[in-house]
Amino acid sequence: MIQVNDTVLVIYHYYEKDQSYIDNFLHFIQFAYRPELNYLIVIAGIASIELPQASNITYFYAKNQNYDYGGYAQVIKDLKFETNYANFIFVNSSVRGPFLPVHSKKNWANHLFDLYSDNIGIVGTAISLTPSHHAISKMYHEKYGCAERNKNILAHVQSTCYVLSQSVLCSLIKDGFYDVHESLSKGETVRDYEMRLSQILLAQGLNLKCLLPEYNKPDYRSLSHEINPSAREGDSGFEYSYFGRTVHPYEAMFVKTSRNTSSDTYLSQLAYSMSFQFPLNADLSCTAAIEGYRRRCELIALNATSSAVKKKSFWSFFNS
């Protein structure tokens, strides 16, 4: 089992697409920051907010190209940090998290690390089984060929949040995985980054794991069929696409906000509850933006409670 300590580097790709992405970043710093971890924030383009500061947080400005793949490729090339840490967590700002129940005593990173072992190449929050008829699967097969296991599905850990060990990252660097020079479309980025990453590791004899338990039973080195009948094109991250229901933020820990599987109001209410169990760490400074996010979550939570009471009182008046 991987231990959470100062040999872990958390690499967060931050892009200010809209207010939701800003809130995703602020939520992450508030609830994912731990003094015993190291943080490298890769900023794609510019940052308009006051950036939280701490001795174990480093900011790196990268060219806004090829999404998080491009940012990671640039920072890995420029900083050459791969031998300085034992394990790496990659997170991008399209997701909000971590979300943890108030009774959770475990460091958020341990939820990922507990699934890691010598025969596992990558651990993420979710695994997709993209069908072979999907346009991006066809793009992948055209460029990289079609392995026996990929005739019906193309399994891959989603790249919004995942863990790699030092040995795995070093092997990827050595094999040229991060040597990206041309501009890629969104589909090409999914093909060359998200899909290719997992497929390289599977070809090396390493398996995949994620936080969703149903997806940890198969051996993806040989799996050739869909395991979730309600998945949308192999993706369990949509409404009612996780074995007939919607994944709860506490299960996935990170939620892709653009899909609206959980409303911004609901996520804010969860964040408000979490703030009592996980207060802002005293080691952080320049936290005005985080405090603003905290106040917005509090306002949403308290106003929602007030509205519910008023609605109940309204109907009670007619039923009395």
At which residue positions do the language-model features occur?
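ER/Golgi luminal nucleotide-sugar-dependent glycosyltransferases, focusing on the catalytic module
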Residues: 1-320
